[in-house]
Amino acid sequence: MKLAREFYARDTREVARDLLGKVLVHRDGGVRRAARIVETEAYHGPDDLASHARFGPTRRAGIMFGPAGVAYVYLIYGTSHCMNVVTGAEGFPSAVLLRAGEPVEGCLHSTRGPGNLCRALAIRREHDNGRDLAGDDLFVEDAPPPRERIVAARRVNVDYAGPWAERPWRFALEGNAFVSRAPGEWRAVRGRRR
């Protein structure tokens, strides 16, 4: 069963945790590809100096200011696509970066890291940016709560963001082999063991 738009219309940090264990599905050219989400990062509001929204509704990040439940796909380093899901209330820019997945079906190659996840599921900015996640081509399927403990750490590659870089808004399923980076300073998320 597909996640409803209401799932995304909540605090981005809650959505980031609650996406863990759900299944990201992309149907492209008659092929279904899917991966279980095992790592996410939350980007919360215009004051979050690690967020693309810190510069306002630019051509790239304007989608973050829109309705929840939409894909925000962008290109980094000129080669890798990254997928976020827009969250929260319209007008308050927030999104969850999907950092890594565990292959479920039809994945083309590695799903460790946001660029690899998009490559494995054939998710591309030119086709999928702005796509409604309540549609039939790109969506997240509900799944039973994960058995693994949810852990948190600082986000990756955001040292430029000052104190915002230290926020523990990167979430993962503890011990999952598909988490994209070495754990570093992981800590358990209170009340989130399922």
From Swiss-Prot:
Keywords, alphabetical: DNA damage, DNA repair, Hydrolase
InterPro entries in alphabetical order: Formyl_transferase-like_C_sf, MPG, MPG_sf
UniProt record, GO biological process: base-excision repair
Pfam families on file: Pur_DNA_glyco
Molecular function in Gene Ontology: alkylbase DNA N-glycosylase activity; DNA binding
EC code: 3.2.2.-
Family: Belongs to the DNA glycosylase MPG family.
Protein's UniProt name: Putative 3-methyladenine DNA glycosylase
Species assigned in the record: Anaeromyxobacter sp. (strain Fw109-5)
